Amino acid sequence: CRRHGLKFGIYLSPWDRNHPEYGREEYVAYFHNQMRELLTGYGPLFEYWFDGANGGDGWYGGADEKRSIDAKTYYERARRTINELQPGAVIFGGTCADIRWIGNEEGRAGQTNWSMVKGRGDERLNDFTCGESDGDTWLPGECDVSIRPGWFYHPREDHQLKSLSRLIDIYYESVGRNANLLLNFPVDRSG
């Protein structure tokens, strides 16, 4: 990223459907240790991205049950850790976001996209496509899109990468409309 002038961000989902301790204090400690490793091992970080996933049905090491975590406590602790170790990083998602989701995974912001909104509650996420000209809170928008049909690598999709022309359109429909652009590059098993 640095070599090509790109800002580096990381994604670590707080939901682990396979970890046997998910939803328990042992897993919270495990997750925060993973966070610390990522926040201290790769240089300056532009963004830490949460997807808001908070449990549900999962295998959880064989338990095959439904679990979740106390999101407010979980994310507030994460925010403190991120601010301590990477104070310049913005946070996306969870209950502690510095930027807002535009509302689609197509990389397209509203034609008018204000960086202000009224309030910050999760119940307002559906109103965040364009922001609000008379908002009272600075919460700029972020568009997210993958260069592939989905967010993860699948060999059968190798021929379905977005074209350069489509990527340029996405740039104009996101950055050109006052939003940050998160462009996902799913990597294969070799990294």
Q: Where are the model-predicted features located?
A:
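Mature catalytic domains of secreted/periplasmic carbohydrate-active enzymes
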Residues: 2-191
